[in-house]
Amino acid sequence: VIRTLSGFLGLESDWDFLPWPHEEVERRPPPAAESSDVLLGYSMGGRLALRILENTSFPKAIIVSAGLNAPDDERKKRDEAWARRFESEDWSTLMRDWNAQPVFGGHVLDRREEDYDRAELARQLREYSPAVLPPPELERIETPILWIAGERDAKYVDIAKRAVARLPRAELWICPNAGHRVPWEQPDSFVSRLRAFIESNMFPPR
């Protein structure tokens, strides 16, 4: 089973293109890993997955387009501004502006207001901001990790390279012709690379 931790505004159904059974992890309690489970975290979910992996081992994990938490007053202010907008602003305007952020490179995912609790979205922006959560202790993570970034997502390519250099058991894949939303921009390449990682014995059990 692929245990997914989606990014902000992510839905469990976003992962229906995967050829494996999958289920979304609750963000708060750390999941107990079964012997064949793979943890997959995207963007904000990737940062939360790293927190889980500091204390819970999985057979393998996949981190996609994730940043690294670090104190940042300006980022905290930006996330607070977004949180306030998510509490009350017109949804269509909000989605237009959210998807227009340079990090997404023009790739738009359709999102319907009825699928969300606005108060919960605002809470996530405040509580899971990379400016609020503690920096990950990557050196502590023993789970084998495949870290993925899109080649057009320069900031997150740099983060991925630095993270993989610190992780004890990790490999890096830069996805061609993709930006931040790798799984949905290049789904076939994404699935192919995940399959190779899941089936490989590059990191045998210790």
What are these regions (language model features)?
Residues 1-29:
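Conserved HGGG/HGGXW glycine-rich cap/lid loop of the alpha/beta-hydrolase fold
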Residues 41-45, 49:
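Gly/Ala-rich beta-loop-alpha elbow adjacent to hydrolase catalytic centers
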Residues 54, 59-87:
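Flexible "cap/lid" loop of the alpha/beta hydrolase fold
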Residues 109-137:
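Hydrophobic, aromatic-rich cap/lid helix
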Residues 141, 147-149:
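Short beta-strand/loop motif that positions the catalytic acidic residue
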Residues 154-160:
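Conserved alpha/beta-hydrolase "acid-adjacent" motif
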Residues 165-181:
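Catalytic histidine neighborhood in serine/cysteine hydrolases
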Residues 178-191:
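Catalytic histidine-centered segment of alpha/beta-hydrolase-like enzymes
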